């Protein structure tokens, strides 16, 4: 209706796994929980993020254990359906953790950032998938590699239809989820990267690393999680 909001999250079970999805409707009358849905892969990690497509009709679940699962979403009922994998873990394919995903404005491409994790991983990647390909996982195309101490972070579609990517400078061994240990500023963490034409193929998407200046500030692994205020009603 262009007024209410859906809040969606997957349940995390310590020392176990769960396929439970919780959906809440936020309206002027309050917050109401919808029936719990059992759908998709049972995840065993709390390193999981959810991202809606620009139209709100699709939802991507990014599992840090190298799974990407795509769902259809009914904006009127809050019901998820049609789960299918964009990527399933293959030991020989990628190292590191899957960190963040984002749709292109036309919803034909999906972008993924991975972060290095562990002593044997020194590369973080920006990757594109073609959601219209007969075999989506086989369409995986690496756009750019970041080498330690530089790591990728969060992907976010902006109101200008460009996709922004934060970076993290891991130079002080403060731990994976912590802020910098010092006050040193570097070009690599004072600028974020930009995909200027994300509807295009990987070769033509015009990715420019470290190209958007943050006005003297530093970035980390994350970006703001802003809702899409321009979505409007379906009818």
Give residue ranges: language-model regions.
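Beta-propeller fold recognition
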Residues: 1-73, 77-86, 93-235
């Amino acid at each position: 209706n262009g007024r209410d909001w859906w809040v969606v999250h997957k349940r995390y079970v310590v020392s176990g796994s769960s396929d439970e999805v919780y959906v809440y409707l936020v309206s002027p009358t309050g917050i109401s929980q919808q029936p719990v849905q059992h759908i998709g892969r049972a995840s065993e990690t709390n390193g999981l993020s959810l991202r809606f497509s620009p139209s709100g009709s699709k939802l991507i679940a990014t599992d840090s254990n190298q799974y990407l699962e795509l769902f259809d979403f009914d904006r009127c009922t809050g019901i998820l359906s049609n789960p299918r994998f964009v990527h399933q873990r293959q030991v020989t394919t990628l190292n590191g953790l899957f960190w963040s995903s984002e749709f292109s404005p036309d919803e034909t491409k999906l972008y993924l950032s991975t972060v290095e994790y562990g002593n044997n991983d020194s590369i973080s990647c920006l990757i594109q998938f073609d959601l219209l390909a007969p075999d989506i996982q086989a369409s995986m195309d690496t756009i750019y590699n970041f080498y330690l101490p530089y790591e990728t972070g969060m992907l976010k579609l902006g109101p200008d239809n460009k996709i922004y990517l934060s970076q993290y400078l891991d130079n002080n061994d403060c731990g994976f989820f912590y802020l910098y240990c010092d006050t040193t500023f570097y070009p690599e963490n004072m600028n974020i990267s930009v995909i200027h034409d994300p509807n295009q193929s990987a070769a033509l998407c015009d990715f420019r690393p470290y190209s958007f200046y943050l006005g003297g500030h530093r970035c980390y692994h994350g970006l703001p999680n802003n809702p899409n205020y321009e979505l409007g009603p379906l009818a």
